[in-house]
Curated annotation (Swiss-Prot):
GO MF term set: FAD transmembrane transporter activity; folic acid transmembrane transporter activity
Result, substituting residue 235 to R: In RREI; results in impaired FAD transporter activity and lower FAD, FMN and riboflavin mitochondrial levels, when expressed in murine skeletal muscle cells; motor function impairment shown by a mouse knockin model of the mutation
Statement: the UniProt record of this protein carries the keyword Repeat: yes
Tissues/organs with expression: Ubiquitous.
Primary site of residence: mitochondrion
Gene Ontology CC: one annotated term: mitochondrial inner membrane
Organism: Homo sapiens (Human)
Name of protein: Solute carrier family 25 member 32
Membrane topology annotation: Multi-pass membrane protein
Transmembrane segments: 26-43, 89-106, 123-143, 186-203, 227-243, 281-300
Length: 315
C-alpha cells in the first residue's frame, strides 16, 4: 500500500507540474536564444579561442578581441567568424526554450495555492533545476560547437579539417569517443547551472523590487529599456560569480588537449596560469553575453506576453 501511495503521490505531483506547462514559454525562449546568438556568434567564437589559450604551439596567438576578429576574417572571411554557428543556434535556441519552459512550469508549480511570492532561494533552486534538466538534453550540442570553433589553420576551406559540420561532428565524437565524449564538460556544466540560477534569481528580484519602487503591480510588464537594464545587471552579476567554470568546461571539451577530469584541468590551469587563467576570455564574454542576454530577455518577454495574451483571448 505504501508503494502504491508513493506512486500515486508522485504521479499526482507530475500531473500538477504538467498543468503549468506553457508552449508559449518554449517558443518565446527559442526565439530569443536564436536571435541573440545569431547576432553575436563571432564574439562567442573569440571567447572560446581565448578560454583555451594555454600556450600550446598549434594555437594562433591573439593580442586582443579586435586582433582575433580581424585575423579570423583575413584567414577565413565571414564563414570563419561563424564557425560552429549551427550547433550554437541549435543549442542556444533549444537551451533557452527549454530553460524558460521548465523554469516557468517549476515556478508555477511551487506557487500554486500560495498567497505569498517565492523567496529568493526558491527562485534560485527553480532555475537550477531547470538548468540541470536542460543541460541533460543539450550538452552534446555544446561539445559539438566547441570542437567546430577550435579548428585552426584556415580550416573553413581546408579539405583536411577534422569536422565538416554539426552532424559530422556529432557522429565522429560518438563513433570515436562514445556517449562519454558527447558529455564531456557535463560536470562543470552542472556547476554552470549556478550561473543561470543566480541570473534568474537576480532578474526576478530586480523586476519585483523595481515594480514595487514605482508602485506598480509585481507582475506588471516593463518597457524595453527597463527589461534591458534589469537583464544586463543580472547577467553581469552572474558572470562575475561563475565565469571560471566556463574556462574549465571549454578546456575539457578541447580536442587538442587531454585532461583526466575537472580536477586535472583546475590543477594544471592554476599551476601554469594562476587565477588569471580562470578568467581568460571574460572581456569578450561580457561584451557578448550582456547584449545577448538583453536581446534574449526582451524578445522572450515580449513574445511570451503576446502569445499568452492570445491564449487568454481564445478562452
Amino acid at each position: 500500500m505504501t508503494g502504491q501511495g508513493q506512486s500515486a503521490s508522485g504521479s499526482s505531483a507530475w500531473s500538477t507540474v504538467f498543468r503549468h506547462v506553457r508552449y508559449e514559454n518554449l517558443i518565446a525562449g527559442v526565439s530569443g536564444g536564436v536571435l541573440s546568438n545569431l547576432a553575436l556568434h563571432p564574439l562567442d567564437l573569440v571567447k572560446i579561442r581565448f578560454a583555451v589559450s594555454d600556450g600550446l604551439e598549434l594555437r594562433p596567438k591573439y593580442n586582443g578581441i579586435l586582433h582575433c576578429l580581424t585575423t579570423i576574417w583575413k584567414l577565413d572571411g565571414l564563414r570563419g567568424l561563424y564557425q560552429g554557428v549551427t550547433p550554437n543556434i541549435w543549442g542556444a535556441g533549444l537551451s533557452w526554450g527549454l530553460y524558460f519552459f521548465f523554469y516557468n512550469a517549476i515556478k508555477s508549480y511551487k506557487t500554486e495555492g500560495r498567497a505569498e511570492r517565492l523567496e529568493a532561494t526558491e527562485y534560485l533552486v527553480s532555475a537550477a533545476e531547470a538548468g540541470a534538466m536542460t543541460l541533460c538534453i543539450t550538452n552534446p550540442l555544446w561539445v559539438t560547437k566547441t570542437r567546430l570553433m577550435l579548428q585552426y589553420d584556415a580550416v573553413v576551406n581546408s579539405p583536411h579539417r577534422q569536422y565538416k559540420g554539426m552532424f559530422d561532428t556529432l557522429v565522429k565524437i560518438y563513433k570515436y569517443e562514445g556517449v562519454r565524449g558527447l558529455y564531456k564538460g557535463f560536470v562543470p556544466g552542472l556547476f554552470g547551472t549556478s550561473h543561470g540560477a543566480l541570473q534568474f534569481m537576480a532578474y526576478e528580484l530586480l523586476k519585483l523590487k523595481y515594480n514595487q519602487h514605482i508602485n506598480r503591480l509585481p507582475e506588471a510588464q516593463l518597457s524595453t529599456v527597463e527589461y534591458i537594464s534589469v537583464a544586463a545587471l543580472s547577467k553581469i552579476f552572474a558572470v562575475a560569480a561563475t565565469y571560471p567554470y566556463q574556462v574549465v568546461r571549454a578546456r575539457l571539451q578541447d580536442q587538442h588537449m587531454f585532461y583526466s577530469g575537472v580536477i586535472d584541468v583546475i590543477t594544471k590551469t592554476w599551476r601554469k596560469e594562476g587565477v588569471g587563467g580562470f578568467y581568460k576570455g571574460i572581456a569578450p564574454n561580457l561584451i557578448r553575453v550582456t547584449p545577448a542576454c538583453c536581446i534574449t530577455f526582451v524578445v522572450y518577454e515580449n513574445v511570451s506576453h503576446f502569445l499568452l495574451d492570445l491564449r487568454e483571448k481564445r478562452k
